[in-house]
């Protein structure tokens, strides 16, 4: 997931 960088939860 690219958005993983913006989602610390992931």
Swiss-Prot record:
Catalytic activity: quinoline + A + H2O = quinolin-2(1H)-one + AH2
Pathway listed: Xenobiotic degradation; quinoline degradation
Highest taxon, organism lineage: Bacteria
Keywords noted in UniProt: 2Fe-2S, Iron, Iron-sulfur, Metal-binding, Oxidoreductase
Its EC number(s): 1.3.99.17
Subunit comment: Heterohexamer of two alpha chains, two beta chains, and two gamma chains.
Function of the protein: Converts (3-methyl-)-quinoline to (3-methyl-)2-oxo-1,2-dihydroquinoline.
Protein name: Quinoline 2-oxidoreductase gamma chain
Organism whose genome encodes this protein: Comamonas testosteroni
